[in-house]
């Protein structure tokens, strides 16, 4: 039986994700972001709710990406997630994409020319953002055309790159329905962005998400629930450059902007530049919010839930890797757990996220 | 003409304070806490409002105590404040007290025996709180009876101690009306505690404070407006012992208590012990809130306001000391100004507290 790995955020889980899981083959392992996501913001609902939605709709195992993998630029995000899936025994990597490309060929090229490609990046002008640089790299070495540039496209290329040398079969799955950033509501498969935007429109949420009740009943948050805390952090710390990825330049920009703004979006607008993209600034604000430091990744893999079929696989994996299924006095990953504590501050109904919580078990035939 | 110095918090200003100012002689200089007060909490209204109330009711000059003088145990508070008043040319120190004691004699004893008295403190058991120790010290060396122990009594003794060797005439003024901590409303002169407690009772506030409208119209805060920020600080910082007066023991106690409490008062209750008094814990929480460090005191004296009579005196003083009347790009005291920024976070209507603000001028005949 194939073991398919899928990297996901499910922010929130919707019919597009369900379709992706249906297209994937064999046992399906999802490596999912925890309570903070790649674009640098809190997830709309907590990791347990999102894991349960996934398990009720096709996933067999959901494991958690540590904070410092989940909140990273595309390359680090993909690398960290693919490493975990590979450790978990995946032989196939399935991912959504808007483009019909030969990703295996792209991975092969990267495997062959990784050094030249990395060297090429170094030669590019520093006025370009990192995404712009990688785009130029792919264009030069593979001839890909970025005219239809989309976030999933960039992520898919990052997966190809991350799986180079890993003996993983790549299975791109063409996305159905709305594009990633679409805020349109009138589509069969609404995007996660549209659902977050219209989360208070119950009818729309019921139409566009399976297991909708889980989503609707969970405490929902967005960046603005954390604005006061971020502002306080920036104002109260004389130095900010102990925080991961904060340099003196960005610290100064944040310190002078913070006294004039009233929301995270205003702050991001004021601080972002061509080189400091909005996504990068949002990630930096997330690092500041949770006071992130440069840290080692945890050794164990934290399991959020599984089906019976998934449980069989976990039993086998336990012999060779460290599976963390319940976090007690010894932390799994201090950084992620601190981030979770702070995530809880965004809404008084968010439950304890780690200590003593057991994986979700979905009883169904494998 | 006598120049009388008065140490005050005016939290808020009431008829008892007005009486004290009336009893004082000559030019009246008040050294007042800024936005955080000695017992370790945010002042109910900002320093500008409190200074204006004082200037409208008898004070000639109001200068600001730097944060690290204002939020300190009685001895350091008194010492820092008396030093500033002495620098400002005060020859008399007036203060309220419940006890008719010969404070000049007490100051004389301290002047003579300071070393023995300090050595005596060292011999006392560490299970005693600092206030308990100083109480024993005064009992042993001066025979004072502490049966009617009150905060003002302790402060008055601290003033006596602080003025030792300073050539300051001590003028104790017997308090009228309610005792310091009284929460009773039915008294001619209500205590500041009672007024804070019943701040939403407009009739009571009008009865017990002069210049009531200033108080009633100002944005009012209390500790609970800052609970979310303190909780966030404790949760997000792996180490707390970089904060002034936070040691490993108190840091651990705070870290384990914070996940179980829902208010500052609950937190103080959980963390305080016989040795860590509630006042000390509140001060520590204030240090954490504003991220205070051990710092040097500022050189200049920050003037919050003056009458015409006060202005004459300031002109003379300017020749020998640094008077800061407007804070621009160069900070007066970074710690105080950071504390003020954070004070502002407690209520969205609190105005900028430092940058570009000029002293209050009250036009009246000297």
Curated annotation (Swiss-Prot), chains A, B:
The keyword tRNA-binding applies. Keywords: ATP-binding, Cytoplasm, Ligase, Nucleotide-binding, RNA-binding, tRNA processing, tRNA-binding. It catalyses: cytidine(34) in elongator tRNA(Met) + acetate + ATP = N(4)-acetylcytidine(34) in elongator tRNA(Met) + AMP + diphosphate. GO terms for cellular component: cytoplasm. GO terms for molecular function: ATP binding; ligase activity, forming carbon-nitrogen bonds; tRNA binding. It holds the Pfam family HIGH_NTase1. InterPro entries: Rossmann-like_a/b/a_fold, tRNA(Met)_cyd_acetate_ligase. Its main location: cytoplasm. GO terms for biological process: tRNA modification. It is an enzyme of class 6 (ligase). It is found in: Cytoplasm. This is tRNA(Met) cytidine acetate ligase. It comes from Streptococcus uberis (strain ATCC BAA-854 / 0140J). The gene is tmcAL.
């Amino acid at each position: 039986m194939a073991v398919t790995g899928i990297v996901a955020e499910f922010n929130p889980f919707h019919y597009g994700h369900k379709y992706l899981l249906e297209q994937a083959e064999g046992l399906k392992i999802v490596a999912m972001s925890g309570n903070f996501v790649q674009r640098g913001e809190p997830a709309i609902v907590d990791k347990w709710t999102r894991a349960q939605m996934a398990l009720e709709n096709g996933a067999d195992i959901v494991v958690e990406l540590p904070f410092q993998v989940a909140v990273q630029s595309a390359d680090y995000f993909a690398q960290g997630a693919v490493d975990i899936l590979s450790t978990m025994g995946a032989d196939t990597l399935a991912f959504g994409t808007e483009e019909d490309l030969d990703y295996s060929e792209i991975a092969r090229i990267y495997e062959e020319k990784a050094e030249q490609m990395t060297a090429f990046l170094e030669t590019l002008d520093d006025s370009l953002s990192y995404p712009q640089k990688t785009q130029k790299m792919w264009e030069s070495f593979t001839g890909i055309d970025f005219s239809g540039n989309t976030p999933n496209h960039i992520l898919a290329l990052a997966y190809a790159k991350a799986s180079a040398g890993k003996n993983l079969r790549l299975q791109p799955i063409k996305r159905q329905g709305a594009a990633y950033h679409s805020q349109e509501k009138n589509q069969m498969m609404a995007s996660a962005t549209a659902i977050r935007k219209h989360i208070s429109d119950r009818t729309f949420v019921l139409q566009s998400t399976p297991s909708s009740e889980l989503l609707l009943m969970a405490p929902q948050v967005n960046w603005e629930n954390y604005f006061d805390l971020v502002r306080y952090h920036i104002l109260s710390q004389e130095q900010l450059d102990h925080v991961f990825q904060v340099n003196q330049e960005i610290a100064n920009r944040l310190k002078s902007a913070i006294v004039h703004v009233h929301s995270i979006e205003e702050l991001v607008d004021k601080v972002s530049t061509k080189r400091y993209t909005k996504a990068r600034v949002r990630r930096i604000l997330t690092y500041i919010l949770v006071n992130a430091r440069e840290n080692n990744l945890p050794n164990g893999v934290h399991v959020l839930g599984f089906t019976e079929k998934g449980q069989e696989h976990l039993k086998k994996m336990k012999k060779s890797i460290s599976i963390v299924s319940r976090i007690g006095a010894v932390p799994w990953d201090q950084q992620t757990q601190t981030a979770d504590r702070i995530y809880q501050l965004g809404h008084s109904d968010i439950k304890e996220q780690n200590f003593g919580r057991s994986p979700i078990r979905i009883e169904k035939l494998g």
